[in-house]
C-alpha cells in the first residue's frame, strides 16, 4: 500500500457536463435500451479512460497509477457498467446469502434488512449511504426502518437514476442522493446518526482514507456498518493463481486494489472505530452459495421468476448478452467498446466464482462498528 494517495481534484461541474453529454436522458430508461441512448463520442472517452488502466498492467507501478486515479477509474467504470448491472442484477448492486425457498429479490432485501437490524437503525435517524449506487438498498432500508437517508456517490449518472427512482416510488421526502468523493466528504462533521456501505468502499485506494471520513461525519456514539469486499486469510499474494483471481476481480469490477481482511480490520481500528460485530457471511457453509447466480447452477434456483434472472446472470446468459451487444455495436446501435465492457464483466464473474469456491474472496465481510460516545475516554 502506498504511504499516501493523492486525493482527486473536485470538479463537479465538469463531471456533470460529461455525464449529461454521455447519458443524456437515458437515466429514465433501463437496461439495453438505456445503453443504446448513449452518445458515441463520450462513450469512447469513458471506455478509453477506464481500460487504459488495465492493459496488462500487473506491476507495482501500474497498481500505483490505478490507486492515484481512483476517482476517475471508478467513475468511468460505472458510466460503462451501470446499465448492464441493472439489466442483469437489478437496482441493488450486491451479493447476498440464499436460503431454501427464498427468491433472489427476497434474499437481496433480507441482506439489506440484516445490516439495518445489526446497526439498529430506526425512524429517528439520519443515515448516510456511502457509495449508494442507483439507490436500491437505500430505498429498501428506508421502507424497512422509516429512517431518512442521504446517498453519496461519485457517479453523476447513478445519482440521476437514484433520484429518479426516489421520485417514482414516492420516497423523495426521505431519500436524497448527492455527488461526492468518499475520500473527501463535504458533509459537516458529526452530522449523521449512522453510516453504512454495501460493497462500495472496496473502490477506495486506501481503506483508512474512506473509514476516517466516515468516522468524521458520524456523531459520537454513532454506528457504522459495512459489507466489505476483501481477500480472506487464505489468500496468498505470492501465489500466482491467487493473484490472477484477485486481478480478474479488480479488472472487471473497477477496483484499484483488493486488500485482505486483516487490512480492513486494522484500518477500522486505526481511525478510532470499536468493532462490535464481525462475521464473514460468505463463510457460513450455506446450502446455496452466494455466487450461484454467476455460476448458473440451476439446482439452486428457488422460484419460477428466478429462472429468468439466473439465466441472464449465468455463463450462457452472459455469453448471449455479450454477443448481442457485439452485434449492436457493429450495427451502430451501441457505443464502440460496449462488447469490451461485457468481456470485462465476464472476467469478473469467472474470478468472483472461483474466488468464492476456493474461499479466497468474500463480498460480505460484515463489520458493525461504533464511534466512541466520549472520544476522550
Curated annotation (Swiss-Prot):
SUPFAM superfamilies: S-adenosyl-L-methionine-dependent methyltransferases (SSF53335). This is Sterol 24-C-methyltransferase. Its EC number is 2.1.1.41. GO terms for molecular function: sterol 24-C-methyltransferase activity. Keywords: Lipid biosynthesis, Lipid metabolism, Methyltransferase, S-adenosyl-L-methionine, Steroid biosynthesis, Steroid metabolism, Sterol biosynthesis, Sterol metabolism, Transferase. One of its GO terms (cellular component) is endoplasmic reticulum. Pathway: Steroid metabolism; ergosterol biosynthesis; ergosterol from zymosterol: step 1/5. It comes from the Eukaryota. PANTHER family: HYPOTHETICAL LOC100005854, ZGC:194242. It comes from Debaryomyces hansenii (strain ATCC 36239 / CBS 767 / BCRC 21394 / JCM 1990 / NBRC 0083 / IGC 2968) (Yeast). The lineage of its organism: Eukaryota, Fungi, Dikarya, Ascomycota, Saccharomycotina. It holds the Pfam family Methyltransf_11. The gene is ERG6.
